[in-house]
A protein has these predicted regions:
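Positively charged n-region of N-terminal signal peptides that target proteins for export
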Residues: 1-6
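Bacterial N-terminal signal peptides
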Residues: 10-19
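Bacterial signal peptide processing site
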Residues: 21-26
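Extracellular mucin-like PTS domains
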Residues: 31-64
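A conserved glycine-rich beta-strand in the N-terminal activation segment of trypsin-fold
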Residues: 67-71, 80-102, 108, 126-128, ...
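Active-site region of chymotrypsin-like
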Residues: 77-84, 141-151, 176-266
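A generic structural motif
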Residues: 85-87, 121, 167-169, 220, ...
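Conserved active-site neighborhood of the chymotrypsin/trypsin-like protease fold
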Residues: 90-94, 101-176, 260-264
Length: 267
């Protein structure tokens, strides 16, 4: 078991949360149900150290630090959140993505690594997208769709103790919401999504677990403002998870061009 520490230099084993499994001809996301055709997701840990961070992520003020995110906020957020999948690699990849502009969405880089045309589930249909920015160190990717999908979510910052919620999809493509709390802002350093040395990312340490398929999902505060993007759990089920701070999203947005990025490697 890995024990989580918040002191500088504490080493954590993180588990990426996109669901992966053997590809099938149906193109459906892998199921986590215990059936003869179910697949087991790959959970390659990365060695990561964390240090407290006070770097601001936005000028949007944080929400109240008490209570839970209201159901009305969760419902409004849900309209901008979609499941995403791809079958280009040896394993199916399933995660969550959300709108930051009518035709731009954010997800985790490990969800779409090696995927040329990520497929979004939007309502009862499907929408193709292309990867227009990709950073294996911050574990973020930005997708563009040919059509506008709706109203984007605002982004801002959170402080320790803020009540937040994850709005995402599970590995079966079913909607989920989880109430969490921001423990502290950290600097997570270590390997990138490919296991190579990286400079790290500004992240949030969260009290509460997340699950397979949740990667790329937005962490929202009581006003519906996105304060982080979920990317990992601690190995061992200790009730701690991690989200990339939105300041990293703003950095990646500056790299978005009119054309898709060159093909990325599968993990």
């Amino acid at each position: 078991m890995n024990r989580l520490g918040t002191a500088a230099g504490a080493v954590l084993a993180l588990v990426a949360l996109s669901a992966t499994g053997a590809c099938t001809n149906s193109g459906e996301p892998p199921s986590m149900a215990p059936t003869s055709t179910s697949v087991t997701p790959s959970m390659a840990p990365t060695s990561t150290s964390v240090t407290p961070s006070t770097a601001p992520t936005s000028t949007v003020p944080p929400s109240t630090t008490s209570g839970e995110v209201p159901d009305t906020v969760l419902a409004a957020t849900r309209a901008a959140v979609h499941s995403v999948r791809g079958l280009d690699c040896r394993k199916a990849q399933v995660g969550t993505t959300f709108l930051i502009a009518p035709d731009l969405l954010v997800t985790s880089a490990h969800v779409v690594a090696g995927i040329e045309v990520p497929i979004l589930s939007v309502g009862t249909g499907e929408v193709s997208s292309r990867v227009v920015a990709f950073d294996p160190v911050s574990d973020l990717a930005i997708l563009r769709t040919a059509e506008e999908l709706g109203e984007p979510l605002a982004m801002g910052e959170a402080t320790a103790g803020t009540a937040v919620a994850l709005v995402a999809y599970d590995s079966d493509g079913m909607p989920v919401e989880r109430h969490l709390t921001v423990r502290q802002a950290i600097r997570a350093t270590g390997e990138d999504i490919y296991g190579e040395p990286g400079s790290g990312r500004d992240a949030l340490l969260l009290d509460g677990s997340v699950a397979y398929g949740n990667s790329g999902g937005p962490i929202v505060d009581g006003s519906g403002t996105v304060v982080g993007v979920v990317f990992a759990n601690t190995r061992g089920g200790e009730g701690t998870s991690f989200a990339v701070q939105v300041g990293e999203v703003h950095v990646l947005l500056a790299e978005v061009g009119s054309s898709p990025v060159p093909p990325t490697e599968c993990r």
